[in-house]
Amino acid sequence: MRTIISLLLLSAMVFAVIEAISLEEGLQLFEGERGCVGENQQCADWAGLHCCSGYYCTCRYFPKCICRKDSGK
């Protein structure tokens, strides 16, 4: 009986550690995207708001620079 309880406690501790690590990695990924804007939103490559990953800032109609979807070229 003690063995079963010990195994359950050990597996619960392992699960808690794994969840804590995955949560920390998720928060680090989110911090990199903080303050970014999406498609057709106003951006500024040199300062201020930047485009989220998968988009790039184009200033075709300066001074209104906007984020466009990155085609992967």
From Swiss-Prot:
Domain of life (superkingdom): Eukaryota
Signal sequence residues: 1-20
GO cellular component: extracellular region
Sequence similarity: Belongs to the neurotoxin 07 (Beta/delta-agtx) family. 03 (aga-4) subfamily. Aga sub-subfamily.
Domain remarks: The presence of a 'disulfide through disulfide knot' structurally defines this protein as a knottin.
Function in brief: Insecticidal neurotoxin that modulates the insect Nav channel (DmNaV1/tipE (para/tipE)) in a unique manner, with both the activation and inactivation processes being affected. The voltage dependence of activation is shifted toward more hyperpolarized potentials (analogous to site 4 toxins) and a non-inactivating persistent sodium current is induced (site 3-like action). Interestingly, both effects take place in a voltage-dependent manner, producing a bell-shaped curve between -80 and 0 mV.
Protein name in UniProt: U3-agatoxin-Ao1k
Species classification: Eukaryota, Metazoa, Ecdysozoa, Arthropoda, Chelicerata
